[in-house]
């Protein structure tokens, strides 16, 4: 899921784009969260016996437990979360979804075998692979959020794309997801690990798109071409193309069209492009995703007072949660929702958009950086050729 190896490319090429910090550093900020990705992470947090959390009736409750307590943790730290759920997947994603379904079926068979003959590690590994987020999981989490007074929206298609729209329009500070393709949808800031448990002690990663592009010396179109070449959810990857090769090819040839042209003409035949590889369609999905505009009435979000008695009815009487814990958490949520109304200092200052002259200057800077990197690649190639041509022992 997402873009293969993109984080390691950014870490190597644009380290200044990544900031790490504690959850409390996000105090006073509104954040749009990829709900489906979060629910999936709650569901794969299986116990050592390979089972998900269940109530006495045998119903899975991992998703509700995760959504309830992780959301409480965010609000405790002064964050105002809003969740974005996936709608229907784009047609181009159907191939990837079919593959995931096949992998899950194979994992289910592997899980049964591991339960009979394998170790605890095998059971846990296969349990994770069988997990999928269902409509029921989504519906129950939406019901829970409504009772908590936390807003949510269902995206027309990809949740990450909708999160990016809201962040770009300034409705939220950032988009939060583990999927790196959120950056391809033009999210100015991506937060990762925001919904992780406190026990994992993972710092919150804050990735700034503008600094990513600057570090790579690329404009957005080139960046998306790089991401498609690295491997995205919409297309099969090209065999033998890893992160360093993908980066080198985009820097040398400039566009995916020219990379494909070069691959097809390569006399050594090193790369086999999959037969059905509509990269132009994938690029269009990143540039023109099906999303609700930020000024859509459904994007007018409101954080409400939690319905504590409703939470008791749903979580305690229907799902078997502890009444004392839910009541205590509900009271704390109500109190923290009031304090999270406090704004950060930067919220009082309006960020002025760049002038046309500033945009042109920024574009020139990126082009110069790209040219320098292309020259460097050419020089490295020449050096390698010289070394190869040198007689041994010379």
Swiss-Prot record:
Similarity section: Belongs to the XPG/RAD2 endonuclease family. FEN1 subfamily.
GO biological process: base-excision repair; DNA replication, removal of RNA primer
GO MF term list: 5'-3' exonuclease activity; 5'-flap endonuclease activity; DNA binding; magnesium ion binding
Biological role stated in the UniProt entry: Structure-specific nuclease with 5'-flap endonuclease and 5'-3' exonuclease activities involved in DNA replication and repair. During DNA replication, cleaves the 5'-overhanging flap structure that is generated by displacement synthesis when DNA polymerase encounters the 5'-end of a downstream Okazaki fragment. It enters the flap from the 5'-end and then tracks to cleave the flap base, leaving a nick for ligation. Also involved in the long patch base excision repair (LP-BER) pathway, by cleaving within the apurinic/apyrimidinic (AP) site-terminated flap.
Keywords: DNA damage, DNA repair, DNA replication, Endonuclease, Exonuclease, Hydrolase, Magnesium, Metal-binding, Mitochondrion, Nuclease, Nucleus, Phosphoprotein
Cofactor(s) this protein cannot do without: Mg(2+)
Region described as N-domain: spans on this chain: 1-104
EC nos: 3.1.-.-
Region annotation Interaction with PCNA: where it falls in the sequence: 341-349
Record note on quaternary structure: Interacts with PCNA. Three molecules of dnr-8/fen1 bind to one PCNA trimer with each molecule binding to one PCNA monomer. PCNA stimulates the nuclease activity without altering cleavage specificity.
Region of interest (I-domain), ranges: 122-253
PTM comment text: Phosphorylated. Phosphorylation upon DNA damage induces relocalization to the nuclear plasma.
Positions contributing to Mg(2+) 1 binding: 34, 86, 158, 160
Disordered as annotated region, ranges: 356-394
Positions bound to DNA: 47, 70, 158, 231, 233
Top class in the EC scheme: hydrolase
Gene3D superfamilies hit by this protein: 5' to 3' exonuclease, C-terminal subdomain, 5'-nuclease
Protein known as: Flap endonuclease 1
Protein's gene: dnr-8
The keyword Magnesium is annotated on this UniProt entry: yes
Taxonomy, superkingdom: Eukaryota
InterPro entries membership: 5-3_exonuclease_C_sf, Flap_endonuc, HhH2, PIN-like_dom_sf, XPG-I_dom, XPG/Rad2, XPG_CS, XPG_DNA_repair_N
